[in-house]
């Protein structure tokens, strides 16, 4: 039997002739600006975050600014979930200042083995990809951006203060726009206290005149409490900043022993359900 001749559709089809069109845009003569090693920038420290905040928090709008809160509270949540903290305090104050405090182990304040002129606290706050969540020894589970979160908050804050109660001593260090304003200093004793407090004001050079929304902050804190059942989050807000008291109380204790089950029960309310559980 004669073999069937295979048909190559590409060969059989005639090739359309390209019609030359004159470009509507006339090429412009540009001076040769050159491109040398001197044009290669190396951004150090937290400068990349300030130059391109969208790469780290998704933009410079209200949603992005509120994400700063998520990064700070995630560090405290990690301490609570790991069993080292029993509560987290969130306070929103005048001047667009937000603080998050926990009673966890406290950020280490001793000298860092690699950067001997800095404390571990300063390294964490001023260096990208510095933290205790990479090796898996300090934390079994963790949230946030793993070594990026709190340093990004520091980079995008016009004023940030960290207080650490550790080894019965109280330490404090101040920062502005990612840079330390001074060295870590001991400010007192903390015999019956431990943990970390981060207080910050978002930088208007980055976010403009955008203000934190108390109702949104409260909702975010409540969501964290639902997500990690049993963790206690204490909410406090300056009454003068609250526009809708139904959506945001001045004070509240958020603790849900059953976690997401409690959330579902709140959403369902009195409606009939298909199954009892």
Where are these regions (language model features)?
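Short beta-strand/loop element within the Bergerat-fold HATPase_c
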Residues: 87-94
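Conserved short strand/loop->alpha-helix "switch" segment adjacent to the catalytic nucleotide/phosphoryl-transfer site
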Residues: 51-69
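Conserved ATP-binding N-box helix of the HATPase_c
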Residues: 63-87, 149-156
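Short, intrinsically disordered, charge-balanced linker/junction segments flanking boundaries
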Residues: 272-277
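Short basic (Lys/Arg) and small-residue
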Residues: 124
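GHKL-type ATPase core
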Residues: 2-3, 7-17, 21-39, 96-120, ...
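Alpha-helix capping/hinge segments and adjacent helical runs
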Residues: 45-46
């Amino acid at each position: 039997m004669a073999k069937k001749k295979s048909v190559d559709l590409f060969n059989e089809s005639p090739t359309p002739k390209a019609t030359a069109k004159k470009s509507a845009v006339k090429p412009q003569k540009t001076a040769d600006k050159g491109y040398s090693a001197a044009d290669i920038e190396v951004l150090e420290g937290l400068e990349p975050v300030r130059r391109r905040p969208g790469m780290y928090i998704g933009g410079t709008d209200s949603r992005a600014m509120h994400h700063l809160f998520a990064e700070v509270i995630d560090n405290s949540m990690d301490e609570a979930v790991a069993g080292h903290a029993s509560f987290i305090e969130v306070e929103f104050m005048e001047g667009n200042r937000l603080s998050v405090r926990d009673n966890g182990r406290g950020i280490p304040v001793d000298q860092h083995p690699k950067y001997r002129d800095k404390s571990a606290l300063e390294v964490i706050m001023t260096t990208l990809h510095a933290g205790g969540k990479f090796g898996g020894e300090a934390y079994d589970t963790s949230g946030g951006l793993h070594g990026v979160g709190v340093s990004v908050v520091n980079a995008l804050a016009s004023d940030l203060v960290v207080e650490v109660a550790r080894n019965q001593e109280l330490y404090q260090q101040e920062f502005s726009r990612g840079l330390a304003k001074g060295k870590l200093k001991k400010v007192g004793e903390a015999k019956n206290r431990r943990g970390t407090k981060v207080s910050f004001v978002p930088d208007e050079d980055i976010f403009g005149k955008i203000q934190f929304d108390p109702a949104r902050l409260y909702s975010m804190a409540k969501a964290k409490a639902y997500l990690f059942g049993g963790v206690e989050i204490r909410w406090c807000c300056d009454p003068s900043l609250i526009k809708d008291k139904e959506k945001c109380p001045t004070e509240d204790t958020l603790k849900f022993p059953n976690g997401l089950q409690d959330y579902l029960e709140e959403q369902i309310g009195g409606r009939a359900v298909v199954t009892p559980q």
